Regions:
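General small-molecule cofactor/ligand-binding pocket signal
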Residues: 79, 130, 241
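Alpha-helix C-terminal capping segments
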Residues: 60, 173-175, 298-301
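Short beta->alpha junction loops/turns
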Residues: 46, 81-84, 135, 161, ...
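Short, well-ordered turn and helix-capping elements at secondary-structure junctions
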Residues: 28-31, 44, 91, 110, ...
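Phosphate-binding loop of NTP-binding sites
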Residues: 9-12, 86-220, 224-236, 291-294
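Acidic, Mg2+-coordinating active-site environments of NTP-dependent enzymes
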Residues: 67-75, 181-305
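N-terminal leader/targeting and accessory segments in enzymes
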Residues: 1-90, 282, 288, 302-303
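Glycine-rich, charged/polar anion/phosphate-binding loops
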Residues: 25-27, 165-168, 251-253
Length: 307
């Protein structure tokens, strides 16, 4: 019987180690939130050093620790590596390769966490659904969340953040999403880029950096949509779905009625399907997120009865 998460034998295989079997329940970088059975990665950063917390990790019930220097005073199983962050990335990439999970990667200048959290809420009754935690979307958090995803997960939803060009590419090489979603291109990160076009190019890494992708979902009304579409045409991605508030997309708003407190929407989906829902007047900004979610569920062939 396979373990619920990555197993010690699989870790031994990847890192040429010889540790005896122990139950692994996920992974952590922080002893304050570490759970019993978690792998502890002693990350050495500019302002803190995880190696100082090996004893705390042992007391909290960590299963094993990845370290750059062995703590001989601890009885915790330890694997010495050259760089613990690289080890985290390598282990997450390896574990991902063992899974049959459909992975959905979400990026955009705004709305990533809200969209992912809404998906989590809608599918809360579903078993075998995993959504990465809020803001765990960088080189530390995303691979950590892959290791926290149970082996039997059917659909995994992850957000990918960036501040510089090339960051999403590195995350995609680990995550290998089956479906990639770009919510929007805005000037949120303009401080590190010269133009919105540069942001669009950097965001496009979510679908140009992997051959695993079956489907791409784009907001047809976002900045530089034509650029993103042109990049899509140069890939081997089988399916593209777009959404907008207008009727020139795969998923669009067919009817819109506004009352004092609610915006009632009737949305058209491929196959002549219609779905109705409402959002509060003060949450009109969530409409694009809702359209993205509906498009994603269609691409996954998930029944819209769950909405």
């Amino acid at each position: 019987m396979k373990s619920s998460h990555i197993s010690i034998s699989e870790i031994n295989n990847l890192f040429n180690a010889k540790h005896s079997e122990i139950k692994i329940t996920g992974a952590s970088l922080d002893t304050r939130t570490l759970k019993k059975g978690n792998i502890f990665f002693a990350i050495k950063g500019k302002n803190s050093d995880g190696h100082k917390f090996i004893n705390q990790a042992e007391k909290k019930g960590a299963s094993i620790a990845f370290v750059q220097k062995i703590n001989s005073k601890s009885n915790l199983k330890q694997i010495k590596v050259k760089n613990t962050l690289s080890a985290l990335s390598s282990l997450a990439r390896y574990y991902r390769s063992l899974l049959n999970t459909q992975i959905i990667g979400i990026t955009g200048s705004v709305g990533k966490t809200g969209t992912k959290d809404a998906i989590s809420f809608i599918l809360k009754e579903h078993k075998n659904i995993f959504c990465s935690r809020q803001s765990y979307n960088n080189k530390y958090g995303m691979p950590l969340e892959i290791l926290n995803m149970p082996r039997k997960t059917k659909f995994g939803f992850f957000e990918l953040g960036m501040n510089h060009s090339g960051e999403i590419k590195r995350l995609v090489k680990i995550l290998k999403p089956n479906i990639s979603i770009i919510l929007n291109i805005e000037n949120v990160h303009l401080g590190n880029f010269k133009s919105l076009k540069e942001i669009a190019v950097a965001k496009s890494e979510i679908f140009t950096s992997s051959e695993n992708i079956d489907s791409l979902i784009l907001n047809k009304e976002t900045n530089h949509y034509n650029l993103l579409y042109r990049y899509y045409k140069s890939t081997k991605i089988k399916n593209i779905y777009n959404y907008s508030k207008k009727n020139n997309s795969n998923v669009y708003i067919k009817e819109r009625k506004v009352t004092k407190k609610i915006i009632q929407l009737k949305v058209s989906l491929p196959g002549d399907k219609l779905i109705s829902f409402g959002v509060r007047i003060d949450q009109e900004n969530l409409i694009d997120n809702c359209l993205a979610i509906l498009t994603c569920f269609h691409a996954l062939n998930l029944s819209l009865i769950h909405i």
